[in-house]
């Protein structure tokens, strides 16, 4: 209250003046405690309280008046008051610390800013984040809330002022107790009290500097008050412009009901005006910084004056004044200056309260003459009584102080020069306080005029609230439509998730298909190996057929030889006929025998020709079968190549399906992003509809909103079509996958059928080859029998000795054949047992080789471990201290190590020999197997030997 300083809307801690002391308290409590703890003697703080905008009584009266007029909700604004510093308070201004380019519309009545408090970092100079729609659409809302916000700020100011009063009372009591104790101590025992007074003097000098800083802060507050007045004037000018706009819009609404109230041009114009005001505030901020620099220079001049005053006082003290007299003189001057300052402050408070009472009475008559309320009048009467009682108490205190001042003046022994200087300072402070009072009066007049304009705008606000309620209904309808669209979007999202799951399943199926394709490729390799084996078998069969053809040719040559023998026999018979003419009967018998032989020969020839034809037919059939088999093999190879190509196509198709799935995922993501963008656009439209100032009829009739809604619906329909197209495409891909799977299954079936066919054909061919062998053997036996019969007949025709020889030979031949057959059976059985034994032997050799290698490895490892152990022992012994023993032990260990190294070398040589033997055995076995494979069968050998 006495010297309290309140800063108005400081920008940042960095925007403070550089000369401000960092110890200067930000809260008013600490400031009052420091300024009024002992009461300084300087007159710089006179009129320091004149920078305040409203007194406590005026605040209480306004609070009571507004409290009875309507409900107040402290809970809605307690957070704002708690966050803001208590040292930043002005009328109609926000308690928050905002930059100079920003106004809190919760305090003022600016129509072009949102009604809620905006953070300082979002509304800086050059960054206007508020849209033009919100600037114009929230005018009635801000006008409605201006009163409530001012009431809340006034309540907070009232609470702070009450706290300050309590603190100041306590400080005054403490000061009085200190002064009384100091006076008593000076009277009783002054020598130790002088030391205390010197310490007090030092404290007073420091407090004088603090008061000077507070005086500078008061000057800054005055400048801020001027800036607030300018801001209020700007706001009033903006309100006038808005009133003109409202009038123009109302006139245009009567003439053209379909046209909207506020066009984009008006919004742009208001936005430009808002930017211009921000620029003006920026310029004001610069001027404020310049004023702070000036204040800094003034502070320096004041410090120089204080130093000169201190020097003069020291000179006066050094001239011969007694310490006690100077101390008493200084104490009296201090008390006198403090009392005069207090009186001046009380006078200013009385004047302010009288003015405030008059203004409150005028406001009471003006606001409540139409609708008087008993509760409001009672509250105002109580407030007035409180004010009167406070005024009377203050007048009594003022009289007491005046009496005290007179007593001090009469008792005091102040020097004339100091009194003149103090009087000059008092006059300067009084003139400055009068100037500030005039400024405050102007501000109050502006505020009263603004209240009248607010009342005028409230009538307009009621008309706009009805329109706003209609627009709210329309917004609710739009909200319902938006919720429906959001539900559709959610359904689409679920469908998209389902599609993703299906795509993942398809990817797993594709992976399975790739695995199956790999398995098919492996099966194809195995089938190719089997086909290669079949080709080898066919080559073997062809070789056998060639051998049979050679045998047939040999048989034909033998038949030719037999015919030659027959012709020779005939010649002998003819010679015998010529020689033995006597034996006709023998000749006839011989002729008959010859005829029989010729018949048998012809029959044999016919049978031979028939056999040759049958053999040729069988050979032709075999050749045809071979050709068919080759064709089938080529067909199988073609099918395999086709299957390989189809497998490659399937892989490419699977990769294309995977790429298409990825494309679908990206497309679905783009669709989701587009849906989110459309949702954001819908939300923006909703906010625009909320902030719009038009009525529901104009909003429904406005073509822009309907077009926007239709456009959104069209876009949603388009997105639905795109999602349906994506669904159809996914279904198409699924069908393609099913077709591919069916084709793969068909091809698998075909491959299995071909494998079964090839196996059957191989079996049939083996059977045919076996039948051919059997037939050949039977034919050979038959031909041999026939030849034997022919020989017998020839031998019977010849001498009996020859017959006996032929019979013996035939018997020997049969025995040899039987022996050969038994030998063949034995040979086959022995070959089988030999093969089994060879396999068993190879297995045993492999096991023996493994065991030997393991044993050699174990021995080598054991030897290496022993050698490493010996090396470690040798190293330890070499490191030990005793030399003789260690040398002997080292030598013994080295001998053992050499022996182990020799054993290791021998083991490695044995292992190398074993590996070489194994290699030679394998090489010998492979060469032997090749020889056995290329060696002809014993049947062939026998047949060739027989017919050689």
Swiss-Prot record:
Residues 939-948 have a biased composition (Acidic residues). It is found in: Cytoplasm, Cytoskeleton, Microtubule organizing center, Centrosome; Cytoplasm; Membrane; Golgi apparatus membrane. It is a peripheral membrane protein. The modification N6-acetyllysine is found at residue 10. Residues 13-28 have a biased composition (Low complexity). It comes from the Eukaryota. The modification Phosphothreonine is found at residue 38. Residues 40-51 have a biased composition (Gly residues). Isoform 1 is specifically expressed in brain. A further probable isoform is widely expressed outside of brain It is referred to as ERC1a by PubMed:12391317 and characterized by a C-terminus identical to that of isoforms 1 in human and mouse. The modification Phosphoserine is found at residues 17, 21, 37, 55, 75, 94, 796, 937. The keyword Flavoprotein does not apply. GO terms for cellular component: anchoring junction; centrosome; ciliary basal body; cytoplasm; GABA-ergic synapse; glutamatergic synapse; Golgi membrane; IkappaB kinase complex. InterPro entries: ELKS/CAST. GO terms for biological process: maintenance of presynaptic active zone structure; protein transport; regulation of calcium-dependent activation of synaptic vesicle fusion; regulation of DNA-templated transcription; regulation of presynaptic cytosolic calcium ion concentration; retrograde transport, endosome to Golgi; synaptic vesicle priming. This is ELKS/Rab6-interacting/CAST family member 1. It comes from Rattus norvegicus (Rat).
């Amino acid at each position: 209250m006495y010297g309290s300083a309140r800063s108005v809307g400081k920008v940042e801690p960095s925007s403070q003046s550089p000369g401000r002391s960092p110890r200067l308290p930000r809260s008013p409590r600490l400031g009052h405690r420091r300024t009024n703890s002992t009461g300084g003697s300087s007159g710089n703080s006179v009129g320091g309280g004149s920078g305040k905008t409203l007194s406590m009584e005026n605040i209480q009266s306004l609070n009571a008046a507004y409290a009875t007029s309507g409900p107040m909700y402290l809970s809605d604004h307690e957070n704002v008051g708690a966050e803001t510093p208590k040292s930043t308070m002005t009328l109609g201004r926000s308690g928050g610390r905002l930059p100079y380019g920003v106004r809190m519309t919760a305090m003022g009545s600016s129509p072009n800013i949102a009604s809620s408090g905006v953070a300082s970092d979002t509304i800086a100079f050059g960054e206007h984040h508020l849209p033009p729609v919100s600037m114009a659409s929230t005018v009635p809302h801000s006008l409605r809330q201006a009163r409530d916000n001012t009431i809340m700020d006034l309540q907070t100011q009232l609470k702070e002022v009450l706290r300050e009063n309590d603190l100041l009372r306590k400080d005054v009591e403490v000061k009085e107790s200190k002064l009384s104790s100091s006076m008593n101590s000076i009277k009783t025992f002054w020598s130790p009290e002088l030391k205390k007074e010197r310490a007090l003097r030092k404290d007073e000098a420091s407090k004088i500097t603090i008061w000077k800083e507070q005086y500078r802060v008061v000057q800054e507050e005055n400048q801020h008050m001027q800036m607030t007045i300018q801001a209020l004037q700007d706001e009033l000018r903006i309100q006038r412009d808005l009133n003109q706009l409202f009038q123009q819009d109302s006139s245009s609404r009567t003439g053209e009901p379909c046209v909207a109230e506020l066009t984009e041009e008006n919004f742009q114009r208001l936005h430009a005006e808002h930017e211009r005001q921000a620029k003006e505030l920026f310029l004001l901020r610069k001027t404020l910084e310049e004023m702070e620099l000036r204040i800094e220079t003034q502070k320096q001049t004041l410090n120089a004056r204080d130093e000169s005053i201190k020097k003069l006082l020291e000179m006066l003290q050094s001239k011969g004044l007694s310490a006690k007299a100077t101390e008493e003189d200084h104490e009296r001057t201090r008390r006198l200056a403090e009392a005069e300052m207090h009186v001046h402050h009380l006078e200013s408070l009385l004047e302010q309260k009288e003015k405030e009472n008059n203004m409150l009475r005028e406001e009471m008559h003006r606001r409540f003459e139409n609708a008087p309320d008993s509760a409001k009048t009672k509250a105002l009467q109580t407030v007035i009584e409180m004010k009167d009682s406070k005024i009377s108490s203050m007048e009594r205190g003022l009289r007491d102080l005046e009496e005290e001042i007179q007593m001090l003046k009469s008792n005091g022994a102040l020097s004339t020069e100091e009194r003149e200087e103090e009087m000059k300072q008092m006059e300067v402070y009084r003139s400055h306080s009068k100037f500030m009072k005039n400024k405050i009066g102007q501000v109050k007049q502006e505020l009263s005029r603004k209240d009248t304009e607010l009342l005028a705008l409230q009538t307009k606000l009621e008309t706009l609230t009805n329109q706003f309620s209609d627009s709210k209904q329309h917004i609710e309808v739009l909200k319902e439509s938006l919720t429906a669209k959001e539900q559709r979007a959610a359904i689409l999202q679920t469908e998209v998730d389902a599609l993703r799951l299906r795509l993942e399943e398809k990817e797993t199926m594709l992976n399975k298909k790739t695995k199956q394709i790999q398995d098919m490729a492996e099966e194809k390799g195995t089938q190719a190996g089997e086909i290669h084996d079949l080709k080898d078998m066919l080559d073997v069969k062809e070789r056998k057929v060639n051998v049979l053809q050679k045998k047939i040719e040999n048989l034909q040559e033998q038949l030719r030889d037999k015919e030659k023998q027959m012709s020779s026999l005939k010649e002998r018979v003819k010679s015998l006929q010529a020689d033995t003419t006597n034996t006709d009967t023998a000749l006839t018998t011989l002729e008959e025998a010859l005829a029989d032989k010729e018949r048998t020969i012809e029959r044999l020839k016919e049978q031979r020709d028939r056999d040759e034809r049958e053999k040729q037919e069988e050979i032709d059939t075999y050749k045809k079968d071979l050709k068919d088999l080759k064709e089938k093999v080529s067909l199988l190879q073609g099918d395999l190549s086709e299957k390989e190509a189809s497998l490659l196509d399937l892989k490419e198709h699977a990769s294309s399906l995977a790429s298409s799935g990825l494309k679908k995922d990206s497309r679905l993501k783009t669709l989701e992003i587009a849906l989110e963008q459309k949702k954001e656009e819908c939300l923006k439209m909703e906010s625009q509809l909320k902030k719009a100032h038009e009525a529901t009829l104009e909003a429904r009739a406005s073509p822009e909103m309907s077009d926007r809604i239709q456009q959104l619906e069209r876009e949603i329909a388009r997105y639905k079509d795109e999602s349906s197209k994506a669904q159809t495409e996914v279904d198409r891909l699924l069908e393609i996958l099913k077709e591919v799977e069916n084709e793969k299954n068909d091809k698998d079936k075909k491959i299995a059928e071909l494998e079964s066919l090839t196996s059957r054909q191989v079996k049939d061919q083996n059977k045919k080859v076996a039948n051919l062998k059997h037939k050949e053997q039977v034919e050979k036996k038959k031909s041999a029998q026939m030849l034997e019969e022919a020989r017998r007949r020839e031998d019977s025709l010849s001498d009996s000795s020859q017959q006996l020889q032929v019979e013996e030979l035939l018997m020997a031949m049969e025995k040899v054949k039987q022996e050969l057959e038994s030998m063949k059976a034995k040979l086959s059985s022995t070959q089988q047992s030999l093969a089994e034994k060879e396999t068993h032997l190879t297995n045993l050799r492999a096991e023996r080789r493994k065991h030997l290698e393991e044993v050699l490895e174990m021995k080598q490892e054991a030897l290496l471990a022993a050698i490493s152990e010996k090396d470690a022992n040798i190293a330890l012994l070499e490191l030990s201290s005793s030399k003789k023993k260690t040398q002997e032990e080292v030598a013994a260990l080295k001998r053992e190590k050499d022996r182990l190294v020799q054993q290791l070398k021998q083991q490695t040589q044995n292992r190398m020999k074993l590996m070489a033997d194994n290699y030679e055995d394998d090489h010998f076995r492979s060469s032997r197997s090749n020889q056995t494979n290329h060696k002809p069968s014993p049947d062939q050998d026998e047949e060739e030997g027989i017919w050689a």
